[in-house]
């Protein structure tokens, strides 16, 4: 069983587990969008390639995709960018014909006894997945993607 966690967004990440154990994690692939407030966007072609290269046709695959919402004080451009990234991730998973489960940050964090503290989240992922590349503070999105993949593994199987 392959489980995948996707933290959408241009600073997000995608993580892969096999039977609950670490396989791979990487930052969300992005491409230059052009001028404007938001300069980058998630690259759908690259994301589909990553999803296919890290899965096998003969194994069941289940994806946990974080359901994102606008937060008070966010600008219109950043809200649109996040929604666009979510849609790109959702379409990429659908293109691969993988089963998908939406999950809110509150739900998967509660499962692991976490709060909104991103460093605690990263520390938890480092303990669970010591082989994963999570050593930098900026790897919190990788940590979250790994924990979502573990959440879907633990709650659906």
Region spans (language model):
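Phosphate- and other anionic-substrate recognition elements at nucleic-acid/protein interfaces
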Residues: 1-157
């Amino acid at each position: 069983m392959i489980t995948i966690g996707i933290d959408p967004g241009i600073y997000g990440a995608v993580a892969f587990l096999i039977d609950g154990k670490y396989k791979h994690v990487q930052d969300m692939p992005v491409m230059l969008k052009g001028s404007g407030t938001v300069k980058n966007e998630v690259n759908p072609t690259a994301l589909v390639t990553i999803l296919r290269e890290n899965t096998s046709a003969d194994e069941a695959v289940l994806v946990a995709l974080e359901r994102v919402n606008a937060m008070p004080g966010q600008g219109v451009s950043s809200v649109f960018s996040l929604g666009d990234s979510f849609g790109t991730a959702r379409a990429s998973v659908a293109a691969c014909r993988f089963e998908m489960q939406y999950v809110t940050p509150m739900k998967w964090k509660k499962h692991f006894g976490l709060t909104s503290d991103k460093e605690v989240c990263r520390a938890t992922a480092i303990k669970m997945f010591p082989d994963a590349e999570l050593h930098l503070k900026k790897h919190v999105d990788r940590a979250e993607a790994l924990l979502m993949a573990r959440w879907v593994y633990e709650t659906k199987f």
